[in-house]
């Protein structure tokens, strides 16, 4: 028999011996347990329970994408490594450019917070704005100088003010009263329901 045949036989025997070792030794040295817990399905460190159709965190896909990117990088660099002498400086420059592009992409992903999963990372995010900033006035934003600023649609009706809470009619005088009410919008974005023009006339009559 040739040396090639002997090496093939040795490889097959070593593979069989390894399988037998992994099956027999744990059975002889390992402990045994009995009961319902032995029959439970245990996979990836988690006891299976509940519905299998659950939401999977999208961060898992980020890890998978990173793995694919750098796995392919290692494959290409292996091809360069085995032919580094033949490739010369030109091959070195090409490999350096390739690695630089991947590093730039990795830094960009890290700057976007793609790998920030810890609770402490969430606390460092920008706090949500719950109050109006200084100098903010919704009344100034929605203020009209006159009824002529409102556009008339093809049906001849004047559209409502942008907040959708001011009733605008075809009566010009009614619209003027509504425009005075618009000037009293508070900073919370809620439109006041008081007719200030009517209230002012009532106050003048009482006086």
UniProtKB/Swiss-Prot annotation:
One of its GO terms (cellular component) is NADH dehydrogenase complex. It is an enzyme of class 7 (translocase). Keywords: Cell inner membrane, Cell membrane, Membrane, NAD, Quinone, Translocase, Transmembrane, Transmembrane helix, Transport, Ubiquinone. Its EC number is 7.1.1.-. It is found in: Cell inner membrane. One of its GO terms (molecular function) is NADH dehydrogenase (ubiquinone) activity. It catalyses: a quinone + NADH + 5 H(+)(in) = a quinol + NAD(+) + 4 H(+)(out). It is a multi-pass membrane protein. It comes from the Bacteria. The chain crosses the membrane at residues 6-26, 62-82, 87-107. Pfam families: Oxidored_q4. NDH-1 is composed of 14 different subunits. Subunits NuoA, H, J, K, L, M, N constitute the membrane sector of the complex. Belongs to the complex I subunit 3 family. NDH-1 shuttles electrons from NADH, via FMN and iron-sulfur (Fe-S) centers, to quinones in the respiratory chain. The immediate electron acceptor for the enzyme in this species is believed to be ubiquinone. Couples the redox reaction to proton translocation (for every two electrons transferred, four hydrogen ions are translocated across the cytoplasmic membrane), and thus conserves the redox energy in a proton gradient. This is NADH-quinone oxidoreductase subunit A.
